[in-house]
Amino acid sequence: MTARNPDVAAGAAPEADLTGWVKEAFTASGFTYDVYRKGEGPGVVLIPEMPGIHPGVLGLGNHLVDNGFTVVIPSLYGTPGAKAVRPGAVAVMVRGCVAKEFSAFATNADRPIAHYLRALARDLNEKTPGPGVGVIGECWSGGFALAAAVDDSVLAPVLSQPSLPIGLTAKHRADPGLSEAELKVIDRRVAEEGLCAIGLRFSEDPLAPGARFKTLKNRLGDAFEVIEINSKKGNEHGFGKMAHSVLTLEVREVDGQPAYEARKRVVEFLKERLAPA
């Protein structure tokens, strides 16, 4: 069972700043990004949601550190430490939509950023204990976590509200977020190594379509654990119709709150998969 943060009010999502995070540039696959590192223990790559490493992402990062992980957060977009809702956030999202590394509108896409993230995962695995690393993707980056698991170093992919490709058509909404060639590697790892993943979404979230989860569930079967939180009108916990960020903005550290319980499950999953032999 994971502990509550005593500094967070029950009615607020956990947040943090960059205190204690060490920045270092990492270059791979033709890209260079600053990467923020903190903690000791098995490694977890935490890929930020749009519009970047905001205080909610850092709150999640600190929670993982407190639970015994080494966490690295690549700054793929935005201004690290800046608020999620701020002037300039829309411009960050627009740039993301046209950046070739993200291929935001492409189906069956082998995204260039996935190659960078695999290299980052391998590097983290070499520097941390345990049999491999976890990768958490959120929102824009949600599907990147599964694409990263093409590399054998990734043992615990977590897809939180995966939003790419942007759901313009039924084909886009049903797309798994990675190429067929990449998905075949995941299939093989599931069959031969017992790889498994967790996917999280709110039931009414149009940005993380249910059709995408259906595609992944049909393909991966029991290896894809789905956590879907009820956000229908009148739901018991008062989630709004646009509830989206399962592990950050919607978490309230109260037992029984679904996003809080989902975060507990993610930590449990990481510990199960990454425990040193």
What do these predicted ranges mean?
Residues M1-A277:
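N-terminal cap/leader regions of alpha/beta-hydrolase-fold enzymes
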